[in-house]
Amino acid sequence: EDRVKLVLKAIAGNEAFALSRVDIDRPSPHFAIDTVNILKQEYPGAQFFYLMGGDSLHDLPTWNRPQDFIKTCDGIGVMRRHADQVDLASLEEVLPGISKKVMIVDAPILEISSKQIRQRIADNQGFRYYLRDAVYKAVLEMGLYR
């Protein structure tokens, strides 16, 4: 529930975002294909674009039912960090049709992962400017990742 609070802080005031509890209120394991299918049932007619990092796109062939996942998503938005190499031609050989679904999203991205932020907190290193102000304050108030 701590992460739920952090997400709510992160999206507060932005009507374009909403928190879904679909992966919170059901038993594990959670697979992306199941999450997308559940959301499509809850929101019939809606388009679903799955956002992921370039590193996750590289690992997609190892996911649960990756071909079904590709078919089910209307698009896959890939946020690419400078160091991420995206080889769609190689992925297309393993997952036919993926190149038609992937959209590389050019947006400012912080060159740090959530795991690295949690480690900085645990190591008592600065992390303030990696998070929205409300999330930063909540992490401090809740004493998370120490």
Model-derived segments and spans:
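Nucleotidyltransferase catalytic core that binds NTPs
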Residues: E1-R146
